[in-house]
C-alpha cells in the first residue's frame, strides 16, 4: 500500500502536467522516480515520463525510448506495458525508419499482449 507521501508526490507530477503541460511535469516526475524507486506507481511514472518526453517541443525521442523501454522490459506485467511497446514500435517505424526494429516490437506486442487494445491495431 503506497504511503500518503508517495501518493501525493505522484499526484503532484500528474497535476503539473494537467496544469502546465508536459514541460512542467518532467522534473516532478523524474523526482518521483528518483525518490520512490520501489513505488507501486513506478511503471506508470516511467510511462508518463515517456509520454511527456514525446509531448514537449522539441520532442525528446531518446528519453522517450529509454523510458518506454523501462516499462516494457522491467515491468512487463504493468497495465501500461502494451502501450509502451506500441509507442516503441511507432518511434522505430516513423521516427527512426527502422523497419527491422519496428517489426520486433510488433511481434513482441502480438506475442506478449495478444488481447491488448494495441495488438488489435495490427489485426484490422
Pin down the residues of each PLM region:
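Acidic, polar-rich low-complexity tracts and alpha-helical solenoid repeat scaffolds
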Residues: 1-124
Amino acid at each position: 500500500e503506497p504511503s500518503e507521501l508517495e501518493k501525493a508526490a505522484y499526484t503532484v507530477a500528474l497535476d503539473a502536467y494537467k496544469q502546465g503541460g508536459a514541460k512542467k511535469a518532467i522534473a516532478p516526475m523524474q523526482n518521483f522516480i528518483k525518490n520512490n524507486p520501489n513505488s507501486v506507481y513506478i511503471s506508470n511514472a516511467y510511462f508518463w515520463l515517456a509520454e511527456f518526453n514525446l509531448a514537449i517541443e522539441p520532442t525528446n525521442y531518446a528519453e522517450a525510448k529509454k523510458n518506454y523501454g523501462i516499462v516494457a522490459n522491467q515491468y512487463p506485467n504493468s497495465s501500461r506495458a502494451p502501450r509502451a511497446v506500441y509507442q516503441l514500435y511507432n518511434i522505430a517505424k516513423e521516427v527512426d525508419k527502422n523497419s527491422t526494429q519496428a517489426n520486433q516490437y510488433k511481434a513482441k506486442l502480438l506475442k506478449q499482449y495478444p488481447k491488448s487494445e494495441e495488438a488489435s491495431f495490427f489485426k484490422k
